[in-house]
């Protein structure tokens, strides 16, 4: 996943949180906002220290980045979103993470094609 698809500045992440438009479950929450000037979507990951040690947090971030990059062709171009990973997600396998995130992407209408 190229770095231009990531939200890096904390002010941009705070702006997404201020919109308060989100969907979530007991494992993840997705906050989103619109960026009409963008030619592609951008995202950020937030994972707290309660999730586990640095190794497990980095593994979760790598997995989620991979899931987003696999489905990057079907995200709406003008969206900014932040994926918040909750501590319960530590017990999930890669396939379970993928399934739950895709359901949340569809619920939050970030994907262009809901049939994917």
Q: How would you label these PLM feature ranges?
A:
Residues 1-116:
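Positively charged, solvent-exposed patches that mediate nucleic-acid binding
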């Amino acid at each position: 996943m190229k770095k231009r698809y990531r939200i890096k500045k904390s002010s941009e992440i705070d702006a997404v949180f201020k919109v308060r438009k989100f969907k979530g479950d007991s494992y993840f929450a997705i906050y989103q906002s619109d960026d009409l000037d963008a030619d592609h979507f951008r995202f950020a990951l937030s994972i707290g220290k309660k999730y586990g040690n640095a190794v497990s947090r980095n593994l979760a971030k790598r997995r989620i980045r991979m899931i987003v990059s696999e489905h990057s062709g079907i995200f709406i171009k003008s969206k900014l979103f932040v994926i918040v990973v909750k501590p319960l997600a530590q017990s999930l396998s890669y396939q379970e993470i993928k399934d739950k995130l895709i359901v949340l992407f569809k619920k939050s209408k970030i994907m262009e094609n809901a049939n994917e």
